[in-house]
Amino acid sequence: MAVKKEPAWVTMGDRVSIWVVTIGALIVAAFILVSFVVTTVGQVSSGEIHFPVFTDTAVPAGEFGQDRGLTAATYTEASLSATGLSTGVVATFIAANAVNTLVALIVTLALAFMGWRWLKGDPFRQSVIYSGIAAAIALMLGPFAALLLSTTATTRALLEIAGPKEGRSDLIFAAEFNLAPFLAGVGLAIVLGIFEAGQKLKADTEGLV
């Protein structure tokens, strides 16, 4: 049975680097999973939820030295801790955290799988493409789902804690989305598409020879 080997340009340093990345990805994945389990168990057992909210609270300019030219200041975010929230709100917070955890696990495990296939001498197997596609989809869709869940949970939690806004300006019902994971997913999908097209072109060319 023929054994596939890396190209001649793959050095020992490359192999060491791939080993480090592969093992590192597995360690990170394990840490992420354990962290999620510990956090979830803590939230369920204590009933206490920690979450950030946007604020628009004025800060007395004198606290920062008004004589130096500062005329106004505001807090833009606050970290809240609350107990006694309804089961639905707690479950929604946990679901949002679960989605973020799942995205991180898919990406890190895909990276570890790619490294493992390379170390086995078969980095271009179709399963590697599939794992990359899974990571790209997770990066593009996961953050949107997590944002929807966390925003819903935060809004419901604020309503339970403070009631309707009724003209207050200290708590803001808003959300912030980071486009970096989505763009990373798009970039990964493009790279995988180009790679797949190149593989098919190579196969077609070899078939003509």
Residue ranges and their predicted role:
Residues 2-39, 107-135:
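Cytoplasmic juxtamembrane interface segments
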Residues 40-51, 119-121, 154-162, 208:
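Transmembrane helix-loop junctions in multipass membrane proteins, especially transporters and channels
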Residues 44-85, 166-172:
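Long, glycine/tryptophan/cysteine-rich extracytoplasmic
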Residues 51-71, 98-108, 143-148, 196, ...:
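Alpha-helical transmembrane segments of integral membrane proteins, especially early/N-terminal helices
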Residues 73-104:
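Individual transmembrane alpha-helix segments
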Residues 93-110, 174-186:
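Selective recognition of hydrophobic, aromatic-rich stretches within alpha-helical transmembrane segments
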Residues 126-209:
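Alpha-helical transmembrane segments of multi-pass integral membrane proteins
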